[in-house]
Regions:
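C-terminal substrate-binding/active-site "lid" region of AdoMet-derived donor-dependent transferases
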Residues: 130-180
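Class I SAM-dependent transferase core
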Residues: 17-48
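Central antiparallel beta-sheet cores of small beta-barrel/beta-sandwich binding domains
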Residues: 181-293, 299-303
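Glycine-rich SAM-binding Motif I of class I
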Residues: 62-66
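Conserved class I S-adenosyl-L-methionine
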Residues: 51-58
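Conserved SAM-binding motif I beta-strand of class I
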Residues: 76-81
């Protein structure tokens, strides 16, 4: 049975290790190279395409960036590392490999890296450090940017794809940076000769989102809200004045303060013979972000 002294020794050792990790994050991350199989799996999951730029935060000897560029002539790369000696060696290796015109390595803290032009972000760092970088990635990387890690995850941000071979092989994960859907949006749809104004409100945590809308004095919840990079889709079933109980399926893309795409509407047809007959209409749809939240405007007792 463990004694109190042995238990305290374990606690002390764990505390010392945590302190070591914290100091390493503040000063430098000791370089431990990824094994070739993991590197290849990371690159395959990221699938960089011609014209894209990949960034490796904590690039070490450059092996992940090199693997992403080799055999892909249209891909450009950037490695960021806090170890000046490794940066110098990586730039020399890039020239020796004939990649000097497409890749560069810079001596920089990962928290200072410019992520705005990245299409792919690679990371293989301390798990705590990757978690600390998560807010920067979500705030600065473009929607749709692929983030690929080996071994460790990014906390509560659930991956969009996982390559897990089981056994002792580390899992490789990929995330798509989600567009910012959260907030208030307004749009209009023309149905049966009437203009219907939608005042919508979305809540979001990473790629998970939900929302509701108001049309006139009625409110309803959106169903099946999906955010994947810039792409967004959701559905709605709601009674609309002059149209009846209408089914709407929205598909579009979020670009800054606009959301644009198409909506498929299924509208009940006025028929004495078949009350299930529907008229199907597809139309363009454009929403704009707003600071005036119509969803909260007074409703009154007349909800027709």
């Amino acid at each position: 049975m463990p004694t109190r002294r042995s238990f305290l020794s374990l606690v002390t050792a764990a505390t010392a290790w945590h302190a070591l990790v914290a100091r390493a994050q503040e000063r430098f991350s000791p370089f431990v190279g990824s094994n070739p199989d993991s590197v290849q799996r990371m690159v395959e999951l990221a699938a960089p395409r011609s014209g894209e730029t990949v960034i490796d935060l904590g690039s070490g000897d450059g092996r992940i960036v090199f693997a992403a560029l080799e055999g892909r002539p249209g891909v450009r790369g950037l490695g960021v590392d806090i170890n000046a000696e490794l940066v110098q060696k990586s730039n020399a290796a890039a020239k020796a490999k004939g990649l000097g015109d497409r890749v560069r390595f810079v001596h920089q803290n990962a928290f200072d890296a410019d992520l705005g032009r990245a299409d792919v972000i690679f990371m293989w760092l301390f798990p705590e450090l990757m978690r600390l970088l998560r807010p920067k990635i979500l705030a600065q990387a473009r929607p749709g940017t692929r983030v690929v890690t080996s071994t460790w995850d990014l906390g509560t941000w659930q991956p969009d794809a996982v390559d897990d071979l089981g056994g002792t092989a580390p899992a490789v994960r990929k995330w798509l940076v989600p567009a910012r859907l959260e907030g208030a949006w307004d749009w209009e749809l023309q149905l049966r000769g009437r203009t219907h104004r939608f005042s919508a409100l979305f809540e979001q945590r990473m790629q998970q989102a939900e929302g509701a809308t108001r049309v006139g004095n009625r409110r309803e919840i959106f169903q099946n809200v999906i955010v994947r990079g810039e792409a967004v889709q959701f559905s709605l079933r709601m009674t609309l004045s002059g149209a009846g109980y209408t089914q709407l399926a929205f598909v579009g893309r979020v670009r800054g303060d606009t959301m644009e795409g198409t909506v498929d509407a299924a509208i009940p047809m006025a028929s004495d013979d078949d009350d299930t007959a529907m008229e199907h209409v597809r139309m363009p749809w454009l929403a704009r972000r707003t600071t005036t939240i119509g969803y909260f405007a007074p409703t009154g007792t007349n909800i027709s």
